[in-house]
Design a protein with these regions (language model features):
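Short beta-edge/loop segments at beta->alpha junctions of small alpha/beta modules
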Residues: 1-92
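Alpha-helix initiation and capping sites
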Residues: 43-47, 96-101, 152
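Short gly/ser-rich loop at a beta-strand->alpha-helix junction or flexible surface loop bordering the NTP-binding
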Residues: 61-69, 92-133
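Histidine- and/or cysteine-centered catalytic micro-motif in compact active-site loops
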Residues: 73-75, 104, 144
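Conserved N-terminal entry element of GNAT/NAT acetyltransferase domains
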Residues: 134-138
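Hydrophobic alpha-helical interaction segments
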Residues: 140-190
C-alpha cells in the first residue's frame, strides 16, 4: 500500500534545509511520478495535502511565503529563520540562464566602485516591456537588450558593465583591466 499524499509531501519537505524555498509545482511533479498521476491531478493532490499539513500543524516549522511557495523555519537566538530571498530571486529571475545581475551592484562586487548601490537591478527574460520593481524581493527588473540564453548571458553582462563604466563613479585607476580579469575568471572568450 502506498503512502498517503500528506505523508509523501511531509517526507519530501523534511529533507529540504531551513529557509530554502519549497515550490508546490515541484512537489506536484514528484507526486505525479510516484503515484502515476496526470499533471492536473498531481497539482490538486499537492494543494490539498499541503493545506492539510498547514491546517493540522503536522509540520509546525512549515511557513507559507506566498501562494505556491513554502519554507521550513527554525528558532534561533535572533528569531525565526526566514526564507532565503537570494534563492527566490535566482529561481524567479535568473535561473536557468534567463537573467543576470547588472547595474552598479555588479561594479561594486568586482571592485570597480566603492559606493554601495541602493538598488539591485536584474536583466531578465521575465521582464516584459519596461523596468519595474519587485517590492517583495527588493529588486528592480528590466528587460534585456536581446533574449538571454546560456551562450550570450556572460557577454550581455560584460557589455552592460562596459556601458556603466562610462557613467558610474569608478574608483579603480584601470577599470578595463579589472573587467578583463573578471571575464577571464568567468571563462568568457571575449
Amino acid at each position: 500500500m502506498k503512502k498517503k499524499y500528506t505523508d509523501f509531501i511531509c517526507e519530501k519537505i523534511r529533507v529540504v534545509p531551513e529557509g530554502i524555498p519549497i515550490y508546490t509545482r515541484q512537489l506536484a511533479e514528484k507526486i505525479a511520478v510516484a503515484y502515476q498521476l496526470s499533471k492536473r491531478e498531481a497539482s490538486a493532490a499537492t494543494a490539498v495535502a499541503v493545506k492539510r499539513v498547514m491546517d493540522k500543524g503536522v509540520m509546525p516549522e512549515l511557513r507559507c511565503y506566498q501562494k505556491g511557495v513554502y519554507y521550513r523555519t527554525a528558532a534561533t537566538p535572533f528569531g525565526e529563520i526566514g526564507i532565503n530571498k537570494e534563492q527566490l530571486i535566482a529561481d524567479k529571475y535568473l535561473l536557468p540562464d534567463i537573467g543576470y545581475e547588472t547595474g552598479l551592484t555588479v561594479l561594486y562586487k568586482i571592485g570597480l566602485t566603492s559606493q554601495m548601490p541602493r538598488e539591485r537591478i536584474l536583466a531578465t527574460n521575465v521582464a516584459k516591456g519596461c523596468m519595474r520593481t519587485d517590492r517583495k524581493l527588493d529588486v528592480i527588473i528590466r528587460p534585456p537588450k536581446t533574449i538571454i540564453t546560456a551562450k550570450n548571458k556572460d557577454y550581455l553582462q560584460v557589455l552592460d558593465m562596459l556601458e556603466l563604466v562610462e557613467k558610474a563613479p569608478i574608483d579603480e585607476k584601470h577599470p578595463f583591466e579589472v573587467l578583463a580579469d573578471y571575464t577571464k575568471r568567468r571563462n568568457s572568450n571575449i
